[in-house]
């Protein structure tokens, strides 16, 4: 059985879609958003950056948002409620709680062992490896849906997960497959 205690995962980015359930006047919104850009000829929304929490928000007149760059779900919530408080100052009315949906979480990690990627690519199903184009194996997990980039050093990037639990489950599935096909060496006891 694969030992998961050596595996480390760290959140690098979370992307969420948000519905504030109210229309916004972007001409007014741009006035209250520091560190923001609005050029409706190029893009139909405001690009706004917060330093605390450190995130970027795409704000649309429909009251829909995209929040990216967060390192935690709590950061997403703090950014949304910070924006709501700013919007109230320009007369925006809110009749219900915002709907926040996590769309993607990106994790970096280390499995704690090295891999021969040529062997992995030959034996492991659901993977791609084009070393001339990219130095890692691309492994696709169907359930939970995620993509894991596996590098020869044992470093990984997991994207597409909607929760930390999904990311861990995807990594477990990869490790089980690697073990099943004999691509993980059992550590010898001395």
Curated annotation (Swiss-Prot):
Transmembrane portions of the chain: none
Intervals holding Sequence repeats: 11-87, 102-178
Keyword Coiled coil part of the UniProt annotation: no
Keywords assigned: DNA-binding, Repeat, Transcription, Transcription regulation
Disulfide bond positions: none
Gene Ontology BP annotations: DNA-templated transcription initiation
GO molecular function: DNA binding; DNA-binding transcription factor activity; general transcription initiation factor activity
Coiled coil found in the keyword field: no
Lineage: superkingdom: Archaea
Matches recorded under HAMAP family: TATA_bind_prot_arch
Protein family according to the UniProt entry: Belongs to the TBP family.
Function: General factor that plays a role in the activation of archaeal genes transcribed by RNA polymerase. Binds specifically to the TATA box promoter element which lies close to the position of transcription initiation.
PANTHER family linked to this entry: TATA-BOX BINDING PROTEIN
Protein name, as recorded: TATA-box-binding protein
Organism: Thermococcus kodakarensis (strain ATCC BAA-918 / JCM 12380 / KOD1) (Pyrococcus kodakaraensis (strain KOD1))
């Amino acid at each position: 059985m694969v030992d998961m205690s050596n595996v480390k995962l760290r959140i690098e980015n979370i992307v969420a879609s948000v519905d504030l359930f109210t229309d916004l006047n972007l001409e007014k919104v741009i006035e209250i958003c520091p560190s923001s850009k609005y050029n409706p000829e190029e893009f139909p929304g405001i690009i706004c950056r917060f330093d605390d929490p450190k995130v970027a928000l795409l704000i649309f007149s429909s009251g829909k948002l995209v929040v990216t760059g967060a390192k935690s779900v709590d950061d997403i919530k703090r950014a949304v409620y910070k924006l709501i408080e700013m919007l109230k100052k320009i007369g925006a009315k809110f009749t219900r709680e915002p709907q926040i949906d996590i769309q993607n979480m990106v994790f970096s990690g280390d499995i704690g062992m090295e891999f021969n990627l040529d062997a992995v690519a030959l034996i492991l199903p659901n993977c791609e490896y084009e070393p001339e184009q990219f130095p890692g194996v691309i492994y696709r997990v169907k359930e939970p849906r995620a993509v894991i980039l596996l590098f020869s050093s044992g470093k990984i990037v997991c994207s597409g997960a909607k929760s930390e639990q999904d990311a861990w489950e995807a990594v477990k599935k990869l490790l089980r497959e690697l073990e099943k096909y004999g691509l993980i060496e059992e550590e010898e006891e001395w």
